[in-house]
Design a protein with these regions (language model features):
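Conserved active-site and cofactor/substrate-binding residues in soluble primary-metabolism enzymes
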Residues: 8, 12, 16, 53-56, ...
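Internal alpha-helical scaffold of NAD(P)-dependent oxidoreductase catalytic cores
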Residues: 24, 57, 68, 93, ...
Length: 291
């Protein structure tokens, strides 16, 4: 059955998802902040709301939409990161504003450019509401995107957020020409660091080795289609954070996520050494060769 899907965010990811599901026969409407339109208009005649905005825009958008949210409208959160003020994930932000809403998370090794090209991929729909996850899995099936489900949205979002930081570190490693041994060691320890965050936040250890954990890390930390990886390459070339972001020319979640996660770690006594090094480099404490 065709769904009426509203997508918040017309960036690369939101646009890709909209085209993917439109090609699968669903009815799509897409909102962008640049349009100047009231996002609440998307709540009407809608079966599923999809949030694909950058992390920096989630809190404001959730607050604006909460007073108008239909009781039975589910939300699929597709943003990856940690809010620097609330120190929580995108779906958790939405849940705070919509305490009664059914919410799921979409995450996995999904480089938007490859999906646009019709290349195959797989992703996870995670929710504490198993019935919702299974329903969305069936409804959102697409020719080139296979969907799985899990019941661990906390671990899924933690992995999706911190892998961006690891991708920055991987870009630095490759940009400095440190070799395959160093890269493999970095990703191995990066995976362990993601596991530390998942466990500390109450997620499941099994999530670490699935599509949302290892799968997403491998894709993001090894491809120049990844903005976070390219950002790391620019840092290795000697760019500071501002210049590197300017050269990317689009949202890069890694820097903000690294700082937010490190604040969480400091408050709770968690040890996240790679994240610490990335933040130290961003703050100018040392250059990429020393990190």
């Amino acid at each position: 059955m065709a769904l009426r899907i509203s997508v918040l965010g017309r960036g690369a990811w939101g646009s890709t998802l909209a085209r993917l599901w439109s090609d699968s026969g669903h009815q799509l409407q897409v909102w962008s902040r640049r349009d100047g339109n009231d996002p609440a208009t998307l709540l009407h005649d809608c079966d599923l709301m999809v949030s694909a905005v950058a992390m920096a825009g989630v809190a404001d958008l959730a607050a604006r939409l909460a007073p108008h949210w239909p009781r039975d409208l589910p939300l699929l959160s597709c943003s990856k990161g940690i809010d620097p003020d609330a120190l929580c994930s995108a779906a958790q932000l939405w849940q705070r504003h919509l305490p009664g809403a059914a919410i799921a998370v979409l995450s996995g090794p999904n480089l938007a450019t490859e999906l646009e090209q019709g290349l195959p991929a797989a992703s996870v729909i995670a929710s504490s509401d198993q019935a919702l996850a299974l329903r969305l899995q069936k409804q959102l099936v697409a020719p080139h995107l296979r969907l799985y489900t899990n019941g661990d949205p906390i671990g899924t979002e933690a992995a999706g957020a911190l892998k961006n930081v690891m991708a920055v570190a991987a870009g630095i490693s490759d940009g400095l020409g440190l070799g395959a041994n160093a890269k493999a060691s970095l990703l191995c320890r990066g995976l362990a660091e993601i596991g530390t965050l998942i466990g500390a936040l109450g997620g499941r250890s099994s999530t670490l080795y699935g599509l949302a954990g290892l799968g997403d890390l491998l894709a993001t930390a090894n491809s120049e289609l990844s903005r976070n990886y390219r950002f790391g390459l620019r840092l290795a070339e000697g760019c500071d954070e501002t210049e590197a972001l300017q050269r990317i020319g689009a949202t890069v979640e890694g820097p903000s996520t690294a700082r937010a996660v490190l604040r969480l770690a400091a408050a709770h006594g968690w040890r996240l050494p790679i994240t610490e090094q990335v933040v130290g480099l961003l703050s100018g404490e040392f250059d990429a060769t020393r990190a």
